[in-house]
UniProtKB/Swiss-Prot annotation:
Segments crossing the lipid bilayer: 5-25, 31-51, 61-81, 88-108
Keyword annotations: Cell inner membrane, Cell membrane, Membrane, Transmembrane, Transmembrane helix
Protein name: UPF0060 membrane protein Nham_2004
Compartments it resides in: Cell inner membrane
Bilayer topology term: Multi-pass membrane protein
Length: 108
């Protein structure tokens, strides 16, 4: 349960943090947008340390699937652009890869 919550929280924190930089550089928002953006990015990094995984790289790779879903949700809910069929097809392919990483049998 904590892994799922950590992944979702990390995705929201990462997207919000990166969007703060996007807003500053691309949308002409105040430089003050960077302060909460940096806090969000630090929170993102911390939350990924809570994931139950024996290897950081595997945790990050599996997180990629969560990030993609969260990014498409952000695209639709915050930016007002509905994901198209290519967004959804690409996401499905990536989610399959993330599932293989997460649930594949491991040699111990």
């Amino acid at each position: 349960m904590i892994t799922s919550a950590a992944y979702v929280g990390a995705a929201v924190a990462e997207i919000a943090g990166c969007f703060a930089f996007w807003a500053w550089l691309r949308l002409g928002k105040s430089v003050w947008w960077l302060a909460p953006g940096m806090v969000s990015l630090a929170l993102f990094a911390y939350l990924l340390t809570l994931v139950d995984s024996e290897a950081a790289g595997r945790a990050y790779a599996a997180y990629g699937g969560v990030y993609i879903i969260a990014s498409l949700g952000w695209l639709w809910s915050v930016e007002g652009l509905r994901p198209d069929r290519w967004d959804l097809t690409g996401a499905a392919i990536c989610l399959l890869g993330a599932a293989i990483i997460l649930f594949g049998p491991r040699q111990i």
